[in-house]
A protein has these predicted regions:
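N-terminal glycine-rich flavin-associated loop
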Residues: 1-5, 31-33
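A short core secondary-structure module
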Residues: 53-90
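Active-site-adjacent elements of ketosynthase-type condensing enzymes
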Residues: 29-40
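A short, Trp-centered hydrophobic/proline-enriched beta-strand micro-motif
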Residues: 16-27
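Acidic-glycine-rich active-site phosphate/pyrophosphate-binding loop
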Residues: 117-126
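Short beta-strand-to-turn element immediately C-terminal to the catalytic PLP-Schiff-base lysine
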Residues: 1, 42, 68-71, 80-82, ...
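Flexible, small-/acidic-enriched active-site or ligand-binding loops
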Residues: 36, 57, 84-116
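Alpha-helical interface subdomain recognition
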Residues: 3-5, 16, 43-48, 108, ...
Length: 232
């Protein structure tokens, strides 16, 4: 962000009056390309005018600030859209197959007007590819944390649960599942660490972050499924 954007938002984000913040990235069409969103941003005088629909936006109804990803002259950019901005509408809560604990919404932008200063990074803009890489590493770390917790819970349960006079952890089928969960979690953890290390070193890191995100997505589903089986 620019110096002005940092002075405006960082003290609030680091203070007690933490504003609700969310990101409007996805769009509800089958060929959605995160680096070529259909939501458009055009310059009109001293403002940007945003038009488009964003889907699966978490906690949008309560957000004080929404980071809207939009295309400006064919390049992806990020815009800081504050709650109550003219032309910004948050639709009723979406009905999802999963993630019922996390409310998601559609965000509609109809000639939504924001000042030129609302463009993240100022006139030069932001490196959206790098932002995407950082977000993938963060989500990968989240998946690893969830999987480690599920594995630990299943392991403790298997050591305590008795069947036929011994803990079920001693049965080969259960032991194999616990072992597979352990190596998958550790492999995913190392992939996330490698991706994070590359980003910290200023390297490209795009391929590593993408690989880590894909692998951890598959891994956490497998580990959670095995944990449910072990718990009966």
């Amino acid at each position: 962000g620019t110096t002005e954007q940092k002075e405006r938002w960082l003290p609030a984000l680091a203070g007690d009056d933490f504003p609700h913040l969310t990101a409007a990235w996805g769009e509800s069409h089958w060929d959605f390309d995160p680096l070529n969103p259909r939501t458009l941003a055009t310059v009109q005088g001293d403002n940007y005018v945003l038009n488009g629909h964003k889907a699966i936006v978490p906690l949008a109804e309560d957000a004080d600030l929404i980071l809207v990803y939009a295309s400006e002259e064919g390049a992806p950019q990020v815009f800081l859209v504050e709650k109550g901005a003219p032309g910004l509408t948050v639709s009723p809560r979406e009905r999802n197959m999963g993630l019922n604990a996390l409310a998601t919404y559609e965000v509609v932008l109809e000639n939504c007007t924001v000042p030129l200063s609302a463009k993240l990074g100022g006139e030069q803009g932001a490196d959206v590819k790098k932002l995407l890489a950082y977000s993938r590493v963060g989500l990968g770390g989240l998946s690893v944390g969830l999987a480690r917790t599920a594995h630990a819970y299943a392991m403790n349960y298997a050591k305590e649960r008795q069947a036929f006079g011994r803990p079920i952890a001693q049965f080969q089928s259960i032991a194999f599942m616990l072992a597979e969960m352990a190596w998958e979690v550790d492999a995913a953890r190392l992939m996330v660490l490698e991706a994070a290390w590359n980003l910290d070193k200023g390297n490209d890191g795009l391929s590593q972050s993408a690989l880590a995100k894909v692998y951890t997505d598959e891994m956490v589903l497998m580990v959670a499924d095995r944990a449910v089986q072990i718990l009966g």
